[in-house]
Amino acid sequence: GGGLLEETYVQLWRIYFAMDRLNLAAAMSLRLQREFPESIYLDEAILQQARVAQKSGDHARAIALYTNLTRLTKSQLRGEGQYGIGECYEGMAKAARGNAEQMYERAFQAYKMVFDQHPESGRVGDAVAKMASFYYQKKDYGRAVDVFEKVLSDHPDANFLDVILFNYGRCLFRLDRRAEAR
């Protein structure tokens, strides 16, 4: 039971989040989790809490919440959670003074896991673009090309090929393989 109350909690947390009242959004999300542990909105609630934590700069908490989301085996949002982990590490790397390289590496690994473990996710294209961007920034065009070629062979009809082909062409151009880049 509790359908109406459950849906009210969901609507309230969405409203609070849209109003940028992050503490209230997180509180409603937690209340939903406590009172309706079997809710079909549970994964969405965890995702929302993680986004609240991420938006407020609490990357460690956001990573913990996103990790919890990736462990919900029936959730369709697991890839979204994995992508969020990558975003958090990337945010931490951008804010870091000295040890940014390690955080960028963790972000890269998180994005790679979206591609490897959640190929059904709507975030695969974004994740691959982020992976390639890391290689591109390091001027490691050969490895970026390898990533793109693997994606093109594994997902020849994916909906994110435009991003892949654009970046693939950029890297081929940088490798002086201009004929292939066309």
Residue ranges and their predicted role:
Residues 1-182:
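Acidic, polar-rich low-complexity tracts and alpha-helical solenoid repeat scaffolds
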